[in-house]
């Protein structure tokens, strides 16, 4: 088992360097299927692989949606229909990737997580991938994805508040993504600002005790929290018109 594990981790690293993220994900899924607690390195390889696989499709979907709206506003119905068909294909790919990693998390990762850090990491991932589903789903499907995302983020936050320091990069990354969820998915800039500001302020208060190893990661996420706060606060001051241009940043 250890030989197989080492082999798949090596292949994942190789595919990351070659920017072959689909193969990177497949290698790390084989490691996860061994039903053992992943090391920090393995956990990060799995996360990076999926982030890149999903990130490319999310970017495609946003571009297609924007072009589709422009074609509709010009009255070019035939072009809009072509784009919609293509966007639907991208949505099918997005759904497949999201449900794939969510199944891996529930079946192979959460049951074998023994540390608070791992538990927070995996529930944050669940929140993220249900959020990605909510980005393009509609009606009852969107409502369900949003509800499951909220529950996962809440579980991660509950665990993080007792298990991780306020400056821990995973706790900060969770606050960053959870606040984006409130802003983009639940259309609640007030709650988004409150969550982001609280996380930022709590981390600032403990900055002197920041672990040297994670200093760069933590301060980068704090900067993203502050950038989002600046954007969202200006939106609120301008009468609540939300920035739907996806200028706000999450960890991806």
Curated annotation (Swiss-Prot):
- Disulfide pairs here are none
Q: What GO molecular function annotations does the UniProt record carry, in alphabetical order?
A: ATPase binding
Stretches assigned to coiled coil: none
Question: Where found in the cell?
Answer: Nucleus; Cytoplasm
Residues with the modification Phosphoserine, per the entry, are 65, 188
- Matching SUPFAM superfamilies, A to Z? 14-3-3 protein
Please describe what this protein does.
Answer: Is associated with a DNA binding complex that binds to the G box, a well-characterized cis-acting DNA regulatory element found in plant genes.
Q: What is this protein called?
A: 14-3-3-like protein GF14 omicron
Gene coding for it: GRF11
